[in-house]
Each structure stands twice: as structure tokens, then as C-alpha cells.
Amino acid sequence: MMANDAKPDVKTVQVLRDTANRLRIHSIRATCASGSGQLTSCCSAAEVVSVLFFHTMKYKQTDPEHPDNDRFILSRGHAAPILYAAWVEVGDISESDLLNLRKLHSDLERHPTPRLPFVDVATGSLGQGLGTACGMAYTGKYLDKASYRVFCLMGDGESSEGSVWEAFAFASHYNLDNLVAVFDVNRLGQSGPAPLEHGADIYQNCCEAFGWNTYLVDGHDVEALCQAFWQASQVKNKPTAIVAKTFKGRGIPNIEDAENWHGKPVPKERADAIVKLIESQIQTNENLIPKSPVEDSPQISITDIKMTSPPAYKVGDKIATQKTYGLALAKLGRANERVIVLSGDTMNSTFSEIFRKEHPERFIECIIAEQNMVSVALGCATRGRTIAFAGAFAAFFTRAFDQLRMGAISQANINLIGSHCGVSTGEDGVSQMALEDLAMFRSIPNCTVFYPSDAISTEHAIYLAANTKGMCFIRTSQPETAVIYTPQENFEIGQAKVVRHGVNDKVTVIGAGVTLHEALEAADHLSQQGISVRVIDPFTIKPLDAATIISSAKATGGRVITVEDHYREGGIGEAVCAAVSREPDILVHQLAVSGVPQRGKTSELLDMFGISTRHIIAAVTLTLMK
């Protein structure tokens, strides 16, 4: 950077001040037009946004999604009007469009989403922006090895979220010197003062304790902000935090630093007078042109990834699907150099260590911080820069559900791998057993849910997920199970496999993972009694192959049994019931885990909770008696 970036001339300083006031005016008009909106939060951040967008950040005005642009994340998404106002000043949004804030069919929503080309991730659920910023910064520093920088504007109130400090620890550990977090310390939260109010020095101490380079500035002093952002650009091997002391509602008489104005526009009868007051402080009509970025990001391709060779397993081989996951990822990493894997300190249990051993430069250890791991994955995947797989015990994704939910709103392309599913986890104990994960991921919009049952189908699930738009979840299991498919078998999303069938099938049994193998064993026992059953492997639980299930049910007298290593609520059985709900004369009998499990051997627990071979045989017998 040039010296005048650190100390801009008098004219530039005045234009930045004037721009900040125009941002306030845009925010006032937009919130008045909508009748609601966090105007006061916009006003406290006006100088920060002015300096970032028109002095510090480098980006192409006409191409907001360019890979070399600096990134900006508004973690405090409720201040969206100030972001939209900035893009009015840039020239990408018209002033008339800004007046459609929060209206139906307008992309200018209450909180920003990637429906807008200048928004990388959806925000509004507080405490998540910095984690995604970490993912962007990590990608820029270690994968793209490019010049772009990442700026995250946060509110002081959201610093109460633990995920913020997970992100702080991550950024410090990985020396993300291309990352700048700005705390807008405006003293007030939604319903009252923030816990530390204007204790900016305490925020500074917290940031420094996490190993961040930190500056404490007057957030309404554009010269001080320019200086701080320039200094941040000179620091090596440390992320920077700028603690900006501001006032909520800055510039608005009787509202500045006053409580009970969060989420409220100024009264319409006062709006014109307030706008005129702010306009009277504007001395120029000039605009500053953003600097162009350094174009040094590599050209990449993350589409149409092919298997380099068929799966190397034979029918009858025994291997756990969660181990196959690690082997398949390492193989996928050879097919495309933009495949990355994130772990929450479980690589030796989930077998992602196999990928790490082969591709160490593309493995990201996120330690025991699952919320941040998901946020980092979201950030890494923005602008199509990586194919991200994040793995953990599936049970621990529950604590990151809000991040997953926001990832869906962000239209994120990330892949989550959940291991140690169900009571088949066995002696590792109940706290490690995922029994709610299918319900959780099935509820996420546009999320594809894979449940492979052997090594062949697991490898296919990995490749399909890598090529699938949107979020994907792959459920893997700990017990070793037999390979039942040949290497030549083809798999598709939404297409089930009928793995056992005959002309005289009496009942359709649907199982996945370990319970598919229990179902096949039950079918063998029943055939010795002269009872033929059809066995289906759904492969994907969402979308579910309703056509195959319905046709099989009709072929077996409308008799269907589902068996799953999951709670009844939200699992395979309920998915099947929904699929056949409009079909007359189809009866679904569900076998699922009920109650809180306990530690034990896999076979003991499958039997104790009614999902073993013995219970499937009993269910078939009972169904045929009705």
C-alpha cells in the first residue's frame, strides 16, 4: 500500500466523511420506506463502511463476485441497510430500488443473503460471520495464495456468542494476517445496553489475549480508521481486530446513544428535518473510486469430477463405511486439487487422517469447535473456490445446527460427513451415538442426505456429493459390514437399490447402513421358512426414491417394514410414510430406536432396541398374520 493509504489527504478525508453521511441518509430513507429496520446500527457503522468501501478495500465495482476482490462480511446482518447503501454509492443499486427494502420480491431483505451478487454468505443469526470470514481468509492465504483480504464487521452484542471466540482462536492459530475483524462497539444491544457497554479496552484485551493484533480507535474518525486499516495490512502472521468505539444512532438528535430505538426507523414526521440536518454537514458531491484488486487468484475447476478408477473392493470384503469415507476422500483428492477436508479433532476416529496423510496441505484441523468448523467450511466454499468436506461424529453436528441452517440460506455447496451413527456405535457410549441426525439434515432445505450401506456405495456417495449443488450429508457407521455391491454398480441420487427380490415376495423391508445387513440376514432366515421378502437399500434418504418403494409395496401386498438405527422421529420410517401417504392399502410398520440407549456391544444394542435380525423376522411374521 502507498503512504497516503495510511494518512489520506484533507480532500479524501472530507469525501469519506461526506460518504458516511450519505450512507446515513440512504439508511434513513430506506427504513422509513419500509416502516422498520435497524437504522441506529447503520448509523454507528457509517464511517467504518465508508472507509472500507471507498478507501481500503480493493474490488471491481462491476463484478462483485470476482475471485480477486477483497471480501466483506456483515456479521451483524441486521445492519443490512448500510450495506445496501454502500452499493448505492458504488453504483450497483439504484436509490429507487433501495426504497424497496424488506418488500416482497425485493432482494434487499432484512438481513443480507447471496441472492445479491455482493453477498457471499447469509448473516443475521449473530456470531457466525467471523467463522465464515476465517474460511475465506484461510482459502486466500493457503489455497489460492492470493492477495485478496477479508473484512468482517461485527457488533459488540454478538461477541457474547461463543462461536465468535472459536473463530478468534482459529484465526490466530493459522496466522490469518489477511483477516480484519471490526468490532462496532456502540454500547447498546437490542433490548438494552450490551454487557460491556463502552468498555472498548476490555474488547481490546480479549482480542489480544487470543493472539490478535488489535487497535482501539474512534469509530467515527475516518482518519483514525484509515490509519488502522493500513497498519493492519502491514502486520504479518497475525489477524487484526479493530475495536471501534461508536454511538448507536450517530448523527440523529435525541436518538443517538439512546435506548429503545433498535429496529425502529425515525418517525416519518421527523425524517425530512433529520435528512436536511445531515445534508447540511456534507461539503462535497464527489465519490471515491474503489481501488482495483491484484488479479492473482489461480484459475480453477470444481465441476464434473470423475472417479479415476472403480472402487477397489470385492463382494464379501468387510470394512466400515466410516473408514471407506477416509479412503474415498483421499482418492477424490487425487482427482481434483481443490478438494479440502476439515476435521473437529476426530481425524483418527473418522478416518479423515487418510486424506491428511496424502494431502496435508488441504487438510484443515478445526479442533473441538464444531460450530466454527461448519462456518469455516462455508467460507472456504464461497465463490466456488473449493470442494469442502467437513467431518465429525454426527452427534456433534447438532451443536452446529444454526450454522447449517444459515448455510442453507447461503445456498452453500458444502459436504458434511457424520460418523458414529446410531446404537451400532456400541461401546463408545450413548453420548457419542447420533440418533437425531437424519431428522436434522432432512429438515434443511436443498440438503441431499446419503446413507450408504457398504464400501462401494460410500465411495459413490463421496463422488456424487462432490458434484452436487447444495448441502450434502453422508451418514456413516462404525461396524464393519460386508461389501454387497460389485465395483461396476452405478449409483444415482434419489435411486434406491432393490438388493433382494423374487416373484413371490410377501413383504418389503427397507433398511440402510447396518440395518440393511440385518434385513438381508433376516431375509435369508425367512427364506428357509418359505417366506420371501423384498429388501430395499434407499441409498439417499432425501430425496427418497418413492417410485421404487411404492412399486415394491404394491408388489408385496402393501406390506412395508422400515428398520433404522435412528430415532423414529424424522428418520427413514417417517420419510417412507410421507412417500406412500397418498397410496391406498399400503401399511408401514416402523422399527426404530426408542428411549435413551446405553453402552454395550453393537449386536447387544441392536437387539435391545428392536432393530436386529430377530426383530425384523418377528415384524415380518406379525405383518403376515394381519
UniProtKB/Swiss-Prot annotation:
Protein name: Transketolase-like protein 2
Source domain of life: Eukaryota
PANTHER family: TRANSKETOLASE, TRANSKETOLASE-LIKE PROTEIN 2
Cofactor note: Binds 1 Mg(2+) ion per subunit. Can also utilize other divalent metal cations, such as Ca(2+), Mn(2+) and Co(2+).
Known tissue expression: Overexpressed in hepatoma cancer cells.
Binding site for substrate: H262, S349, H420, D428
Similarity section: Belongs to the transketolase family.
The organism of origin for this protein: Homo sapiens
Residues that hold thiamine diphosphate according to the record: S41, H78, G124, S125, L126, G157, N186, K248, H262, E370, F396, Q432
Entry cofactors: Mg(2+); Ca(2+); Mn(2+); Co(2+)
A GO CC term attached to the entry: cytoplasm
Keyword field: Calcium, Magnesium, Metal-binding, Thiamine pyrophosphate, Transferase
EC number: 2.2.1.1
Quaternary structure note: Homodimer.
Catalytic residues of the enzyme: E370
Pfam family, one: Transketolase_C
